């Protein structure tokens, strides 16, 4: 594999999107890496996966999906490194009880540990107005194993296709309505202009 910078190691070199739980870094037989979404798109147009760089072929047995290809362990190791500092604790104010919570490590299901374990009260003078920040799944670091959503990659993709198809249909209908409206205005103005000339010439 070529020598890549740290940033280019974190993104798919086909679509230039960062790797995420939805865009997992998949290792081809030739040892090149692509995201699972790009490989899935390649798979729809060809039987076997052909590497875009070296043209090496990765054969998938019948019934195998792209999600069953191995993850690239080097990329997973880089992505899984936590980026928070031990010297800057973050407290989150819980709206339900006014408690300030120190976030604890996430479980495999990406859920906070339950109960008072994660709740640390601060003295009144140190309490600040903080809000919970939700990190999109695209930007969350990958864990070592496959996420629970990996098996649901196909239905998720179908939902996106249905959604984009529906928005395309709505766009076409909206454009057609606007064109009919504008045509109506033009025809109305033309009929008014022709009547005005008729009245003037007759009168």
Swiss-Prot record:
Physiological role: E3 ubiquitin-protein ligase that acts as a negative regulator of mTORC1 signaling by mediating ubiquitination of RagA/RRAGA and RHEB. Catalyzes 'Lys-63'-linked polyubiquitination of RagA/RRAGA in response to amino acid starvation, thereby regulating mTORC1 signaling. Also mediates monoubiquitination of RHEB, promoting its association with the TSC-TBC complex and subsequent inhibition. Also mediates 'Lys-48'-linked polyubiquitination of target proteins and their subsequent targeting to the proteasome for degradation.
UniProt name for this protein: E3 ubiquitin-protein ligase RNF152
GO cellular component: lysosomal membrane; lysosome; organelle membrane
GO molecular function, one term: ubiquitin-protein transferase activity
Pfam family, any one: zf-RING_5
Transmembrane feature ranges: 167-187
EC identifiers of the protein: 2.3.2.27
Gene source species: Gallus gallus (Chicken)
Pathway the protein takes part in: Protein modification; protein ubiquitination
RING-type ZnF: 12-55
């Amino acid at each position: 594999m070529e020598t890549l910078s740290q940033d280019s190691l974190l993104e798919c070199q086909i679509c230039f999107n960062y790797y995420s739980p939805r865009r997992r870094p998949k290792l081809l037989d030739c040892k090149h890496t692509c995201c699972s979404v790009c490989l899935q798109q390649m798979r729809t147009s060809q039987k076997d996966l052909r590497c875009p760089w070296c043209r090496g072929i990765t054969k998938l047995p019948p019934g195998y999906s792209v999600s069953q290809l191995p993850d690239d362990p080097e990329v997973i190791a880089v992505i899984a490194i936590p980026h928070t500092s031990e010297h800057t604790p973050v407290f989150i104010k819980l709206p339900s009880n006014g408690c300030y919570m120190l976030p604890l490590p996430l479980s495999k299901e990406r859920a906070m540990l339950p109960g008072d374990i994660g709740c640390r009260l601060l003295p009144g003078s140190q309490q600040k107005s903080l809000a919970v920040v939700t990190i999109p799944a695209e930007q969350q670091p990958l864990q070592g194993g496959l996420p629970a959503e990996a098996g649901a990659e196909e239905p998720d993709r179908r939902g996106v296709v249905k959604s984009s198809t529906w928005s395309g249909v709505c766009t076409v209908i909206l454009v057609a309505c606007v064109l009919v409206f504008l045509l109506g205005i033009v025809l109305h103005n033309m009929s008014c202009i022709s009547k005005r000339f008729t009245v003037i010439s007759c009168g």
